[in-house]
Regions:
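P-loop NTPase nucleotide-binding/switch module
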Residues: 1-3, 105-106
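Inter-motif core of Ras-like GTPase G domains
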Residues: 2-22
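P-loop NTPase catalytic nucleotide-binding module
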Residues: 20-175
Length: 175
């Protein structure tokens, strides 16, 4: 999604909606989003251009809530924004993915979460699990009982959320 006039593609099984990390939801994005709603297309969201000056992941996610009136579920958070963007944190697997700048991010390495981000990652993961738990009784029960929550608990709940278009997973990066 991202351009007006995609009616032929909206009859598909799903779509990835691209949003600008600097501008968030733009008018043409709203138009295409409404077309996808009309055709009941499940969607994932990708906040793009996180390496640009002025990129602000939290503001872009807030624009999804405010302008599209949807329930975004943040799945990744950026490691740095704008010129400082150097990777992402995968909230499901709790891993840092550092992109190599010499090949423009084509290669990467998995790493531990940077200590200075540990608290914000814990908080973001908690929000993700709570949002996913709305779509799975077993996940909700595990979470409420303080049991460890794994990928196998989270992914089916997110799938349900996406297929029912009740919530939209949000990823980020720079393509």
């Amino acid at each position: 999604l991202g351009a007006v006039g995609l009616d032929v593609h909206l009859g598909r099984n799903g779509a990835v909606a691209l949003f600008d990390g600097v501008n968030g939801v733009e008018p043409q994005s709203e138009t295409v989003w409404r077309q996808a709603d009309k055709y009941q297309v499940p969607r994932l969201c990708f906040i793009n251009k996180m390496d640009r000056i002025g990129a602000d992941f939290e503001r872009a996610v807030a624009s999804l809530r405010e302008r599209l009136h949807v329930h975004p579920i943040v799945m990744q958070i950026p490691i740095g924004w704008g010129p400082e963007f150097r990777g992402i944190i995968d909230l499901i697997d709790e891993k840092a993915i550092h992109f190599h700048s010499e090949d423009l991010g084509a290669s990467y390495e998995l790493d531990a979460i940077p200590p200075e981000m540990a608290e914000s990652v814990r908080e973001a993961r908690r929000h993700m699990i709570e949002a996913a738990a709305e779509f799975s009784d077993s996940l909700m029960e595990k979470y409420l009982h303080g049991e460890p929550v794994t990928r196998d608990d989270i992914v089916p709940a997110l799938r349900r959320a996406v297929l029912t278009r009740a919530a939209f997973p949000v990823f980020c990066g720079s393509s």
